[in-house]
């Protein structure tokens, strides 16, 4: 359920800061290894998105 919710939040164009704070809270809430892996994957997606947007802006 939380994965779908986070996916919906990513489609919503709010600030990256907000996403980062939600990721931190999400990581603190989930203590299992699965939660940590999901958190890392989502964090990687955010970083990749920022890089892509930066490259597009520079062109």
Swiss-Prot record:
Positions bearing the site annotation: Cleavage: 13-14
Subcellular location: Cell membrane; Membrane; Perikaryon; Cell projection, Growth cone
One Pfam family in the UniProt entry: Beta-APP
Residue spans crossing the bilayer: 35-58
Superkingdom assignment: Eukaryota
Biological process according to GO: cognition
Main subcellular location: membrane
Keywords: Amyloid, Cell membrane, Cell projection, Coated pit, Cytoplasm, Cytoplasmic vesicle, Endosome, Membrane, Nucleus, Secreted, Transmembrane, Transmembrane helix
Record's bilayer topology term: Single-pass type I membrane protein
GO terms under cellular component: cell surface; clathrin-coated pit; early endosome; extracellular region; Golgi-associated vesicle; growth cone; nucleus; perikaryon
Keyword Transmembrane helix: yes
Family designation: Belongs to the APP family.
Oligomer and partners: Binds, via its C-terminus, to the PID domain of several cytoplasmic proteins, including APBB family members, the APBA family, MAPK8IP1, SHC1 and NUMB and DAB1. Binding to DAB1 inhibits its serine phosphorylation. Interacts (via NPXY motif) with DAB2 (via PID domain); the interaction is impaired by tyrosine phosphorylation of the NPXY motif. Also interacts with GPCR-like protein BPP, APPBP1, IB1, KNS2 (via its TPR domains), APPBP2 (via BaSS) and DDB1. In vitro, it binds MAPT via the MT-binding domains. Associates with microtubules in the presence of ATP and in a kinesin-dependent manner.
Protein name, per record: Amyloid-beta precursor protein
Source organism (scientific name): Bos taurus
Lineage, opening ranks: Eukaryota, Metazoa, Chordata, Craniata, Vertebrata
Gene designation: APP
């Amino acid at each position: 359920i939380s994965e779908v919710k986070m996916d919906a939040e990513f489609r919503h164009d709010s600030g990256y800061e907000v996403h980062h704070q939600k990721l931190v809270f999400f990581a603190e809430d989930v203590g299992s290894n699965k939660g940590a892996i999901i958190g890392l994957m989502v964090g990687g997606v955010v970083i990749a998105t920022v890089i892509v947007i930066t490259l597009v802006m520079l062109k």
